[in-house]
Swiss-Prot record:
A matching Pfam family: IGPD
Classification via InterPro entries: IGPD_sf, ImidazoleglycerolP_deHydtase, ImidazoleglycerP_deHydtase_CS, Ribosomal_Su5_D2-typ_SF
Compartment list: Cytoplasm
Example of a GO biological process term: L-histidine biosynthetic process
SUPFAM superfamilies named in the record: Ribosomal protein S5 domain 2-like
Reactions that this protein is recorded to catalyse: D-erythro-1-(imidazol-4-yl)glycerol 3-phosphate = 3-(imidazol-4-yl)-2-oxopropyl phosphate + H2O
Name used for this protein in its record: Imidazoleglycerol-phosphate dehydratase
Gene expressing this chain: hisB
Pathway: Amino-acid biosynthesis; L-histidine biosynthesis; L-histidine from 5-phospho-alpha-D-ribose 1-diphosphate: step 6/9
NCBIfam families in alphabetical order: PRK00951.1-1 (NF002106), PRK00951.2-1 (NF002111), PRK00951.2-4 (NF002114)
EC number: 4.2.1.19
Native source species: Pseudomonas putida (strain ATCC 47054 / DSM 6125 / CFBP 8728 / NCIMB 11950 / KT2440)
Catalytic class of the enzyme: lyase
GO cellular component, one term: cytoplasm
Amino acid sequence: MVERKASVERNTLETQVKCSINLDGSGKARFDIGVPFLEHMLDQIARHGLIDLDIECKGDTHIDDHHTVEDVGITLGMAFAQAIGDKKGIFRYGHAYVPLDEALSRVVIDFSGRPGLQMHVPYTRASVGGFDVDLFQEFFQGFVNHALVTLHIDNLRGHNTHHQIETVFKAFGRALRMAITLDERMAGQMPSTKGCL
């Protein structure tokens, strides 16, 4: 089997990001981003997606976290696009529901080649531990635009904002895991009647 790994660097005047991923990993993760709550959420992707993630970022967090969060999403999306390759043999679609106490979220993903994000999370607070939760929209938009996926994210219920967000990221990891899994019955075929994605 071809190794589904990628290492990507993205440098701008605002951030310098390095991202290495292994889609067939065991959930190992290492982060040096400087935004602890984002690192905590990225760890959920690795653990629940069984994806090895190594991400470093030096960003202008002295201004705020916006550029760092968005650019990590962009670079992670670029790494996914590179690692997934031509998409032959993958399940393509993934979905997951994840609860955490009172919170419940659903994530559905399609490695369609068509970027699109529908994200509906009615946060009950504007921040968690000083982190502006609106920035997760920027993270997922950056990921979607560069991984070329269609992504639907819905927090169905919850009143603890930390729980709302954590269920989203856990469900995202689980949905990714389903979508990128190789289907033995596809035997290297493209998962589309068009013959390409």
